[in-house]
Swiss-Prot record:
Pfam families: SecB. One of its GO terms (molecular function) is unfolded protein binding. Keywords: Chaperone, Cytoplasm, Protein transport, Translocation, Transport. The gene is secB. The lineage of its organism: Bacteria, Pseudomonadati, Pseudomonadota, Alphaproteobacteria, Sphingomonadales. Belongs to the SecB family. It comes from the Bacteria. It comes from Erythrobacter litoralis (strain HTCC2594). HAMAP family: SecB (MF_00821). InterPro entries: SecB, SecB-like_sf. This is Protein-export protein SecB.
């Protein structure tokens, strides 16, 4: 089909040969990202601004995923931050930062790793900025969360799960995650 000097050199559009024009390459990427839920509390204002004690920061995070359809998954990065002293809480921030990811033609293991390791890694800097802006808007120094190694945590969790399954083969099966 290629003519001399033609940019298109080989277009095999024969459906029997698999050239039906459909994109069968493995792909994963973000469609959009957004704040799904956010709560910001400043429970002891205005007195909190007179406190001299340095606060202790309690940071909790979790990753969730919900299938929207066969090719789209919503990934949620849940971050809870509480700054407190012996006098009480300075602020409490609860954030669910989410993204819609499209996944096509990936194996289950690759798709799982993208959803629970790579997608949170990509979402985190944006969620970190939301937290920093919220603490600044509360009247405190912006809280800059340290980077999180989501890929390392993912691999660690897989190793833990494999070890738990190996222990379960020799005796009673351990209870599943609640």
């Amino acid at each position: 089909m290629a003519d001399e000097g033609d940019v298109l050199t080989d277009l095999d559009m024969d459906p029997a040969a698999g050239g039906n024009g459909a994109d069968n390459r493995p792909t994963a990427g973000f469609i959009t990202q957004y704040i799904k839920d956010m709560s910001v509390e400043n429970p002891n204002a205005p007195g909190v601004y007179q406190w001299q004690e340095q606060p202790q920061i309690d940071l909790q995070f979790n990753i969730g995923a919900n299938a929207v359809n066969e090719e789209v998954t919503e990934v949620e990065l849940k971050i809870n931050v509480e700054a407190k002293t012996d006098q009480g809480a300075l602020y409490i921030i609860e954030l669910v930062y989410a993204g819609l990811v499209g996944i096509r033609n990936l194996g289950d293991d690759q798709a799982h790793m993208f959803v629970y390791a790579e997608a949170p890694r990509i979402l985190f800097p944006f969620a970190r900025r939301v937290i920093a802006d919220a603490t600044r808007d509360l009247g405190f120094q912006p809280l800059m969360l340290d980077p999180i190694d989501f890929n390392g945590l993912y691999m660690q969790r897989l190793q833990q799960k494999a070890a738990e399954e190996a222990q379960g083969e020799g005796g009673e099966t351990p209870a599943g995650d609640a």
